[in-house]
């Protein structure tokens, strides 16, 4: 999905987590994901690597990683919590409401506008999340 300076396994170890082989498998799958998988999809991918991994192990591991701040949970209005590694560089999301496709993008103009708005209201921005939802334009709308 994104370049990760340190592997999830390294981040977990730094935070004092015991890395079982099953956690390593789940961490590698998250790192290698080009999409934003939900727990059920992580489970499907995990059992292809290690058939002994249970769905409850995936749920517990995802919760552990999320609580440690090394993965981010997203709710893209499709009724599922979806996950990605916490990227080094901030990005926002554009979600296709018809297909569920998630497009990651960066916009210096949007980032600057958000900073300006926070300052105008007397705040220093420390974090934010922008998710845009839409449907593809029809050819006649272009």
UniProtKB/Swiss-Prot annotation:
Entry binding sites for Fe cation: 90, 92, 111, 128
Family as reported in the entry's similarity comment: Belongs to the Fur family.
Keyword Repeat attributed: no
GO cellular component: cytosol
Region (Dimerization): 88-142
Keyword Iron: yes
Entry keyword set: Cytoplasm, DNA-binding, Iron, Metal-binding, Repressor, Transcription, Transcription regulation, Zinc
Function: Acts as a global negative controlling element, employing Fe(2+) as a cofactor to bind the operator of the repressed genes.
Identification of the protein by name: Ferric uptake regulation protein
Gene: fur
One Pfam family of this chain: FUR
Annotated residues for binding of Zn(2+): 36, 84, 93, 104
Domain of life: Bacteria
